[in-house]
Amino acid sequence: MSLTPYSPQPAFKSTLHEKRVYEAMPGKLPDLHNRFSNHTMGLFEKHGIENVAYWTEDVGTSNRLVYMLGYPDLAARENGWSGFQSDPDWQKARAASEENGALVRVSKHSILRLTEYSPR
């Protein structure tokens, strides 16, 4: 995988992470990248969600965006997502980016906690 141009350099500041994988609709990956780089990342930060890193796959043909978010704990995750999803700026950005149809076909996510021996 390669970091996207808008990704921060990965650094694990938090102990709780979320790996999210989005399968974009055919031809919509550039629009998804645009929404993340111009709207989503800033809104995540506004709501206390740490942007760890964003990747695309190097091998094969893929419409996949893989990214990692960080939180101090599960309660912070719930509060961050609740605030993000109800934010009028997010709702406006999402609606505008999906004027011509949905950008994401399938999304998956996993909550991960660093092990004691993991480098930080």
Predicted ranges, named:
Residues 3-12, 34-52, 71-111:
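An amphipathic, aromatic/His-enriched active-site/gating alpha helix that lines ligand/cofactor pockets
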Residues 55-56:
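Trp/Gly-enriched beta-strand/coil motifs that build multi-repeat beta-propeller-like domains
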Residues 113-120:
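Acidic/histidine-enriched, glycine/proline-rich intrinsically disordered or flexible terminal extensions
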